[in-house]
Swiss-Prot record:
Database matches in HAMAP family: Met_tRNA_synth_type1
Entries under CDD domains matching the protein: Anticodon_Ia_Met, MetRS_core
Keywords: Aminoacyl-tRNA synthetase, ATP-binding, Cytoplasm, Ligase, Metal-binding, Nucleotide-binding, Protein biosynthesis, Zinc
Entry protein name: Methionine--tRNA ligase
Length: 600
């Protein structure tokens, strides 16, 4: 029975282009997971979009003398294009400035407020001393009063996991200009997190399948749970849906509150765009559906504590949650099943920093290198379990010594020889025990790699796939069919047949990781259709007449299945080309020189 799998991907912020460190944390792992489950025949809904509200966007707009909407429009397109070119197979990649998102966000706010889970409190708001604008909590840094970490943020300390307010920090400073923020009394709305403390503690304690860092960080956060501000004094954001704020532009819903709601609103938008307006309920109110959230480690508690609290408070109510007389009447929205958090990627030993030039944007990278080469590196050497460093030397080494030399070499030597000598899948003779052993080992990879992917252990899964490819290379080197063909044509045909079957199975195994090259290989092997076909952009017209673009794809047409090879004898091959490009080591110095020029 196919499962309903929600793949909820962190929303990239639309105040600039995204760099490779961003997609290492949320994009590539989520896409690998989604593609695997589609191949398994499960019903996948992968959603996200650009996060377009808040002070950072207004700061860029002020600097350029334009509007926040213009900035959001620009970077929504740039980011969408980057994710398309990287092959991230969203069912819907949308944005938070749609009428649908506003409606869903306001419905959740209103419902939580009516149920007493949103309260009013007077607090000290942080404002920039130079611009007078509200400073988001994450734009304020200082020393943690509990552990002494000197880069604690205004909402939490990433070192000890404590929940903080900007006023808690010792020597707070603005990340915008380095100046101390100005604190002024102001009234805000707060999500009453302590009201959910017991439920959250019991629920998190039951999540034995979570990564230890996610579970421990979340439990630690619960120790000092307090109400969380969900509004800010600014003009750019989702309006507060209460009568007294109908004509006020000085206070809006805080960007973090509406961003996490985006997972739900994007699912609802997908259903509307597909002509099945209630289809989203199959993922959100189906007790058998499973939700997987992908993000960097700095967003853990938003997905393990704050968003679950909002879901618990909303339950089955509100305009969207209610399904009177329907299949899901009275069934609450589902909580996360797993929160897959990645660590941080650094670059040449330093933190990514756009302002300091320590960065390479996705579009810049893909203008010179293949998407699958980047996807390979970010998976095999990425920050899955610990902070890792991207260096150009390591990227070139991994590409040449692993991707090209192992998997690329196996495909090239097999297909080029078979195409030259047979033109189609050859008729094998009797299989020897050695033939059967290598076939069985690769066939077993469907299960072993699949289990690792299902557990979100992407690095181990890719390493196992590469190990299997290496085993087939060893088999060919030992059997030497290019020599055997001179004296025993049938035996050579058998060896190449076995190699083709292994390559065909490995093609499926590599597809979630390397979709572009896997699709080309699929075609070289004589197949038609898509196992990892093209994505597409669609223009969507909202009820208010506005249009926006969504990244999506017709994934139901994909023909791949997570199964061993069924490559038929006699299938005509297409002329193959090498799957990957070997990189000249001179690119290392060229790229380091580019980075140095950005540093000035």
């Amino acid at each position: 029975m196919p499962e309903h799998i929600l793949v909820a991907v962190a929303w990239p912020y639309a105040n600039g282009p995204r760099h490779i460190g961003h997609v290492a944390g949320f994009g590539v792992p989520a896409d690998i997971f989604a593609r695997y489950h589609r191949l398994r025949g499960n019903r996948v809904l992968m959603v996200s979009g650009t996060d377009e509200h808040g002070t950072p966007i207004t700061l860029v707009a002020d600097k350029e003398g334009t509007t926040p909407q213009a900035i959001a429009d620009r970077y929504n397109k740039i980011i969408g294009d980057d994710l398309y070119n990287l092959g991230l197979s969203y069912d819907t990649f949308t944005r938070t400035t749609t009428a649908n998102h506003y409606a869903v966000t306001q419905d959740i706010f209103r419902t939580l407020y009516e149920r007493g889970y949103i309260i009013r409190q007077e607090t000290l708001g942080a404002f920039s001393a130079t611009t007078g604008r509200t400073l988001p909590d994450r734009y304020i840094e200082g020393t943690c009063p509990l552990c002494g970490y000197d880069e604690a943020r205004g909402d939490q300390c990433d070192n000890c996991g404590s929940q903080l307010d900007p006023t808690d920090l010792i020597n707070p400073r603005s990340k915008v200009d380095g100046q101390p923020p100005v604190f002024k009394p102001t009234e805000h709305f707060f999500l009453d997190l302590p009201a959910f403390a017991e439920q959250l503690h019991d629920w998190i304690n039951r999540q034995d399948h979570w990564r230890p860092n996610v579970r421990n960080f979340s439990l630690n956060f619960l120790k000092d749970l307090k109400p969380r501000a969900i509004t800010r004094d600014l003009e750019w954001g989702v309006p507060i849906p209460l009568p007294e704020y109908a004509n006020r532009d000085d206070k809006k819903i805080y960007v973090w509150f509406d961003a996490v709601i985006g997972y739900l609103s994007a699912s609802i938008e997908w259903a509307q765009n597909s002509g099945q307006p209630d289809a989203w309920r199959e993922w959100w109110q189906n007790p058998d559906a499973r939700h997987f959230y992908f993000m960097g480690k700095d967003n853990i508690v938003f997905h393990t504590v704050i968003w679950p609290a909002m879901l618990l408070g909303y339950g089955a109510g509100g305009q969207f949650g209610a399904d009177p007389g329907g299949k899901y009447d009275g069934i609450p929205l589902q909580l996360p099943y797993n929160v897959v958090s990645s660590e941080f990627l650094t670059m040449e030993g330093k933190k990514f920093s756009s302002s300091r030039g320590i960065v390479i944007y996705v579009n810049d990278f893909l203008s010179r290198y293949d998407a699958d080469a980047l996807r390979y590196f970010l998976t095999i050497a990425g920050p899955e379990n610990q902070d890792t460093d991207f260096t150009w030397a390591e990227f070139v080494r991994r590409n040449n010594d692993e991707l090209v030399a192992t998997w690329g070499n196996l495909v090239n030597r097999t297909l080029s020889n078979v195409y030259k000598n047979f033109g189609s899948v050859p008729q094998p003779g009797p299989l020897t025990p050695v033939d059967e052993q290598v076939l069985a080992e690769v066939t077993g990879g469907i299960e072993t790699v699949g289990e690792l992917l299902a557990a979100a252990r992407f690095k181990a899964a890719l390493a196992e796939a590469m190990r299997l490819a290496a085993q087939v290379n060893i088999y060919l080197s030992e059997q030497e069919p290019w020599k055997v063909i001179k004296s025993d044509h049938e035996r050579a045909a058998t060896i190449w047949y076995v190699a083709l079957r292994c390559v065909d199975t490995l093609k499926i195994i590599f597809t979630p990781f390397l979709p572009f090259s896997s699709q080309r290989l699929h075609e070289y092997l004589g197949y038609n259709g898509y196992i990892a076909g093209p994505l597409t952009f669609r223009e969507v017209t909202e009820a208010n007449g506005r249009t926006h673009r969504v990244l999506t794809g017709d994934y139901d047409r994909w023909v791949g299945r997570w199964e061993p090879s069924v490559l038929p004898v006699g299938q005509v091959l297409r002329q193959p080309q090498p799957l990957f490009k070997k990189l000249d080591e001179k690119v290392i110095e060229e790229e380091l020189a580019r980075m140095q020029s950005r540093l000035g």
